[in-house]
Each structure stands twice: as C-alpha cells, then as structure tokens.
C-alpha cells in the first residue's frame, strides 16, 4: 500500500521560511568570506570558518524547516537524533572544505569545480541522511532520475555559492547572490522530496521510533538559529562586512592619504633680505672669503685694509 505523501502540510509557510533560512545563511557566509579576504592572514581562517558555519547551518536549517511540512497521512513520523546530528555535521564540514579551498586557492576552473563537487555532494548527502533519519511504518522508495537531478542542483548551487563567496562585492550584489543561493538550495530540497514515495506495510519494518517533530526538530533548530543570530550581530557591528570591498578600499585610501596637521604650528621664520651695502661689506655667513688682492681691499674709518 502506498502512503499519501504531503510535502506542504502547512502550505507555503514552510517553503518560504526554508528559503529565508538558506538565504540568510548564504548572506552571512558571503559577508564573512569577504571579510577574510581583506583582514590579513592572521584571522583569515577564523573568518572562513565562521562563514562556513553560517552557510552550513543555513542549509541544514532550511532542510529541517522544510521537513516540518512533510507528512504521510497513514502513519506518524519520528526522527532519529544521532542521524539528525550527523546530517548537521556533514553540512558544516563539507561547506567548510569548499570555503577553505576557494578562500586560499582562489576560483580557478579546476579549483572551483573540485570544491563545488565536494560541497554539492556533501549537501546532497546531508539531505538524504536527514531523510533516512525519519522513522515510520513503511519503506521509502526513490525515483532515480529525480535523485540525480537533485544532486546536480546541489553541485551547481554549491559551485555558484563558492564562486560568489570570493567574487561578489558590495551589499546589494551579495544580497542578490544570497537570494539565488536560497532558491537553488531550497529547490534541491524539494526536488529530493518529490523523488520519494512511501510504501506502507503492516509488519512495521520501519517502526516509528525516536522523537517527534516537536520534541526533536524544534529543540535541535535552536542551536543553528542562535549561531546565525550571533553571526548576524557580528556583521551588523562591522561595517566592512556590510559594505564590502569598495568601502574597505576607500577607507584604506582615506587613511593612507590623510595626515593630521599639528595644531597651532608656528610658521617657519623667513629671513629678510640684507641691504645691498651690508651685503657688500659684510658677506653672508658661509660665503667664500674674497681673494687677497686690490679688489678685495676697501677703505673704512681705520684706513685702507
């Protein structure tokens, strides 16, 4: 018997919220990556790690917000806590690998393709590990074509996100790139969801065990949401993260070209020109002594010298 699968139990609330979570994580991750490229090598690894955590948590939060709208009419659904945590770790780690590769090696074709492939496969793995963490009275079956399509979407979205992380500058371009990332990652999630069917059985080969959505998913979403909030506060209080490279460069140029003048500095004294007669009889200090000869002798009150 095939179960009645509904991926939109709460209407458009869950897909819109999922998109916002993915876009938020992408936006914060992009800003942190921009900051790492202009803050020197001392804190570069820290900024890249913070950006990877933001993007990974955003993707994972998007996935499980979408899962809240998933239901099967004929059976209850529960979630395996360890597998759910594994899916979160996979999301953060694979995004971190991609971000660090492009952060240190740039976006050359080979580097970008390799990092995008690793990250995309990791995001797809996160999705299907999260799906497997569900327990219900039945078995899952997947449409192979849609599964392959969802993986391709994940790889393309990850490659585009990594390229944008080290290329896009400015607040509005980053906002647009984050929106595209949110659409792509959310589209990957719902493509993977549409690939799944549930075959119910009376023997309960996948008996519902673990925690329900309210007892497992909602508390587990708290941690990633707090992390996104912390990263958002950091971004708000660092104008270089918000404004991007242009403002950063402008600030450096202004600082390099600005030299404060001393207050109340007295003007340098200017020597008055000496009278011609005095110049004739009393040469300037440092001037060569006149040669000894008739032209160098002159009369004064003491006689001719």
Region roles according to the model:
Residues 1-305:
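Peripheral, non-catalytic segments of secretory and membrane proteins
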């Amino acid at each position: 018997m095939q179960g009645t699968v509904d991926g939109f139990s709460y209407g458009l609330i869950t897909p819109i919220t999922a998109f916002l979570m993915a876009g938020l994580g992408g936006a914060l991750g992009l800003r942190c990556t921009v900051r790492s490229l202009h803050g020197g090598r001392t804190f570069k690894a820290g900024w890249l790690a913070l950006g990877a955590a933001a993007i990974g948590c955003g993707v994972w939060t998007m996935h499980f917000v979408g899962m809240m709208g998933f239901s099967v009419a004929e059976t209850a659904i529960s979630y395996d806590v360890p597998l759910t945590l594994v899916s979160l770790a996979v999301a953060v780690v694979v995004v971190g690998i991609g971000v660090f590769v492009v952060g240190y090696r740039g976006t050359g074709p080979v580097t970008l393709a390799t990092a995008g492939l690793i990250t995309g496969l990791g995001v797809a793995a996160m999705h299907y590990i999260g799906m497997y963490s569900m327990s219900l009275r039945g078995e899952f079956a997947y449409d192979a074509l849609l599964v392959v399509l969802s993986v391709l979407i994940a790889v393309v979205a990850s490659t585009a996100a990594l390229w944008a992380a080290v290329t896009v500058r400015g607040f509005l371009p980053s906002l647009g790139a984050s929106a595209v990332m949110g659409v792509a990652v959310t589209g990957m999630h719902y493509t993977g969801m549409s690939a799944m069917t549930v075959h119910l059985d009376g023997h309960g080969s996948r008996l519902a065990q673990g925690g329900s959505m309210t007892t497992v998913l909602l508390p587990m979403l708290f941690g990633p949401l707090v992390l996104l909030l912390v990263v958002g506060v950091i971004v708000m209080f660092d104008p270089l993260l918000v404004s991007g490279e242009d403002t950063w460069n402008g600030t450096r140029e202004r600082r390099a070209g600005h030299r404060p003048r001393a207050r109340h500095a007295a003007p340098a004294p200017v020597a008055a020109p000496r009278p011609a007669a005095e110049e004739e009889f009393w040469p300037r200090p440092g001037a060569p002594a006149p040669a000894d000869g008739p032209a160098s002798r002159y009369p004064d009150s003491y006689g001719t010298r």
